[in-house]
Amino acid sequence: MVIGTGLAGRVIADALRGPEVTLAGFLSADLPPDGWPYPVLGAPEDAPGLSRDGRGFIVAADSLKDREAVVRAFPELGYQAVIHPAAHVAADAVVEPGAYIGAGAVVGTGASIGAHSVIGEGSIVGALSRIEPYCELLARVNIGHEVTVKDHTFIGHSATLKDKITIAAGTVIQTGEIVVKDMVMKMVYKRGAWIYKENGPGER
C-alpha cells in the first residue's frame, strides 16, 4: 500500500504495475486529485489495521519532511522498498525498507540506499557508494563511486558528485551542480559555491 496521493504516489504506482506485485491501494489524509485512477482505502491513520494481513507499505510524500513525519507517526508498519522494473540494481547492492528506485536508475555493486530514500529516474549511484536514510535524488543525478551522502540530503536534477567524497547530513545541492570535494557541515551548494546553513535536519 502507498501512503500519499500526490505526484510521488503516482510515480510509485507506475513502478508497481508488474506481474510480481499487487498494488492494494492508497491511503491519503486529503481527497485525491480529480481523475485519480487508483483506489483510496482510507486515511494514514487506518494503516495499522490494514497491516495485519501482512501488507507492505511505502510513503509517497512530496517532501523529505513529510515522508519522515509519516514514518515517525507509524513506525510499526512493514515498510518495503519499491524498485521500478526498468531500474538496474546490482545483485550485492542493499536497498533498505521504504526506499524507492526510479525507472532507468542504476545502483552499482556494493552500493547501499538508506531507508525511505528516493533515487530518481535515470540517476546513477556508483559502486560502493552509500546513500543514507531520508535522502532524495531527483532525476539524472550522477553519484560517483565510494561516495557517502549522509541523511536528509536533497540533490537536484542532473547534479554530479565526484568519486570518493562525503556530503554532510542535511545538505541541499541545487540542479545541475558539480561537487568535487567533501562537505562537512550542512550547506546549500548553488552556482558553484557553498552557502552556510544552520545545523539540523534538512528540508525541501
Question: How should these model regions be labeled?
Answer:
Residues A13-A15, A69-A73, M185:
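Short amphipathic alpha-helical segments
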Residues L31-H88:
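Phosphate-bearing ligand-interacting subdomains
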Residues P19-G35:
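NAD(P)-binding Rossmann-fold cofactor-contacting core
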Residues M1, L23-A24, D53-I58:
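Short active-site oxyanion
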Residues S63-A73, L77-E132, R140-V147, A159-L161, ...:
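Left-handed beta-helix
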Residues M1-L16:
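Glycine-rich adenosine-cofactor-binding loop
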Residues P133, A139-R204:
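Glycine-rich hexapeptide-repeat left-handed beta-helix
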